[in-house]
């Protein structure tokens, strides 16, 4: 394994172990929100069934992912053991968001917050029905990435989810709905993405359509050439294909100079290819755009240690400890590994 691989491994190890120590919202709040998240079951034309989740967003209306209900011939929502039929949909196929009309639904309505106002390292949690379970399950994490798209942001978090949770809710610590569980990247070290609630709000006044309406592919299922850059960088980053990442991130930064993550991934590619001067410049640019970008501070700490400035590296650890203890621990371990290799 390369020295960079060791650094990446230590980061992932500490990341996974530290997640369990996150502060959780009160049981009372989670229990209250559980009632707002329902199970969805669909029947397909070939006789098979599919499962998903949905959140109550208005009277007789729930939001889910379009990929949950695509190509279905019937859709039902299960609420407190009652099976209720869906009579119509309001689809936004491109953004993978579908509102389902459920006449006679008796369930509390979620309070819709804001995705655009989320901050990096803000704590969030998800509620859905993964893996065929009968009761809703919650996962807890932090906001790790915000990717501007179509007047809002795609939200990447450290809170995981499984098959069947698609369409479930992501909530902030005040219980506001701030995202819709949607997709994860392939592989063991997956990235988890949520669609923004601003798109949900835009869909509320859309016209109703029949359940049998022909479905269309969402943006994330398009050909590679049509993917947003935030999707393109994942595989080369996780597989350490730095030349590919450098090329993609450079194009991203040119086309979207106001996107923090474009400069971050460019800096990581530069760091990994030993272009440390450019990496430091671009990491500082990331922090100028977002002072709580913990991964940028993490790599600046690595650069400080690499350049023999141990005191500055310790300062970066202290800085991280003020808002992201998990990443601070990652940096501590990475520095210890570097010192052991000398």
Across the structure, where does each feature detected by a protein language model lie?
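N-terminal activation segment of mature serine protease catalytic domains
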Residues: 21-55, 62, 74, 257
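Canonical tetratricopeptide repeat
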Residues: 265, 299, 333-334
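Conserved active-site neighborhood of the chymotrypsin/trypsin-like protease fold
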Residues: 47-49, 58-136, 151-154, 216-220, ...
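Flexible, gly/ser-rich surface segments that form the specificity/activation loops bordering the active-site cleft
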Residues: 24-29, 68, 108-154, 161-165, ...
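Alpha-helical segment of the N-proximal tetratricopeptide repeat
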Residues: 222-261, 265
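Catalytic nucleophile loop of clan PA
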Residues: 55, 161-181
